[in-house]
Regions:
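Conserved N-terminal boundary motif of the eukaryotic protein kinase catalytic domain
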Residues: 16-22
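Hydrophobic packing residues in well-ordered alpha-helices of helical domains and bundles
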Residues: 57, 103-110, 133, 154-161, ...
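Active-site acidic catalytic loop and adjacent metal/ATP-binding pocket
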Residues: 31-36, 117, 163-209, 219-220
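An alpha-helical support segment within catalytic cores of ATP-dependent transferases
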Residues: 2-11, 122-176, 243
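ATP/Mg2+ or Mg2+-diphosphate-binding catalytic cores
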Residues: 262-316
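ATP-binding pocket architecture of kinase catalytic cores
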Residues: 24, 30-132, 139, 146-148
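Active-site activation/catalytic loop segments of kinase-like enzymes and analogous catalytic loops
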Residues: 138-147, 205-240, 254-271, 283-290
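All-alpha amphipathic helical-bundle segments outside canonical DNA-binding/catalytic cores
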Residues: 126-132, 241-253, 278
Length: 316
């Protein structure tokens, strides 16, 4: 959308904005804008009603608020035009403010928040199905490899998907934000606030652990991961030790990164949006890193996919 379109939408929601600043465009098609009048600012989230609605977001927002979990207050909702207006939490997302000095504190506080989310009542939260988890991994094979890189994966990728499915089925299934990563966590008034929670499902424990501990913008850091898993195990008084939690995280990260590589490639193929292509090499590298050393897919990624991806990005 253009700025004038957003200003016009905000006026239909009883907020007479004089300026609109784009914040981010999500893979789902949601657009977040900061809208400002002479004395206040809000966040306008737009989703074309033909593509979906905000009902899941509103339902989860109410659940979070009812259980004292910090999230953006929804001030206005107009389903006919696909808009919510939310309290502006500022720009201090954890990806932006994260550094060597504060990372341990922020990661521990994020894990505390994750534990609270996992403890929410589950009656209103749908459960991920086996088929959904498998279909998400197939995005990697069918979209990222075949359609985007134009390479036919060898049997090691099918075996990796099968092995991942078997492992994540054996994990504890808990409330899963599904995108519990640093850019979706905002430090506001010294509290970590969670956003973009509309896709919350009951799913494997390792998916959200990998979201916060294996970021798309940094190489895997096993020292930090092991330290934080030890902390998390003690905080939630888990019957699973840090070694078991690492196994959950490993397979959760493999499923998650395969899904995201396919999703981001599809955004470019279907909509010609290239804004996330720069993230693909690190996501692929982290996927390779988390695959067990003796698995043949590791070699396929290293020798075939990584060179093809680098060439593809140079050609775009």
């Amino acid at each position: 959308m253009k700025e004038e379109d957003v200003i016009n939408l905000s006026s239909k929601c009883n907020f007479n904005a004089t300026k609109a600043i784009p914040l981010k465009l999500e893979a789902s098609g949601r657009e977040d804008w900061r809208v400002l009048d002479k004395k206040d600012s809000l966040v306008l989230c737009y989703l074309n009603p033909s593509l979906g609605d905000h009902l899941d977001f509103l339902k989860i927002s109410n659940l979070l608020n009812a259980n004292n979990i910090c999230t953006a207050e929804v001030i206005y909702h107009n389903p006919d035009i696909g808009v919510t207006l939310q309290k502006d939490l500022g720009d201090d997302d954890l990806l932006t403010i994260f550094n060597e000095e504060n990372k341990q504190d922020l990661l521990k506080r994020s894990l505390d928040l994750l534990a609270k989310i996992q403890g929410l009542p589950q009656e209103e939260i749908p459960k991920l199905t086996h088929d959904e988890l498998v279909d998400q991994m197939h995005l990697f094979k069918d979209i990222f490899c075949i359609n985007f890189l134009e390479v036919e994966p060898d049997n090691s990728i099918d075996n990796l998907m099968l092995l991942t499915t078997e492992n994540i089925k054996q994990q504890p299934w808990v409330n899963c934000h599904f995108d519990f990563e640093r850019r979706n966590l905002i430090l506001h008034q010294d509290k970590i606030t969670v956003i973009d929670h509309q896709d919350m499902k009951i799913g494997p424990l390792g998916i959200d652990l990998s979201g916060i501990l294996i970021d798309h913008y940094y190489p895997v850091n096993f020292t930090d991961i092991n330290m934080m898993l030890d902390y998390f195990s003690k905080q939630i008084k888990s019957k699973h030790d840090s070694e078991e939690l690492f196994n959950f995280l490993r397979w959760g990260s493999i499923q998650r990164n395969m899904r995201i590589l396919g999703t981001l490639a599809n955004i470019f193929i279907e909509h010609k949006r290239s804004y996330r292509l720069k993230d693909l090499p690190m996501i692929l590298s982290n996927l390779e890193c988390m695959i067990p050393d003796n698995h043949k897919s590791k070699l396929f990624i290293s020798e075939q996919l990584k060179p093809l991806l680098n060439k593809k990005l140079l050609d775009i």
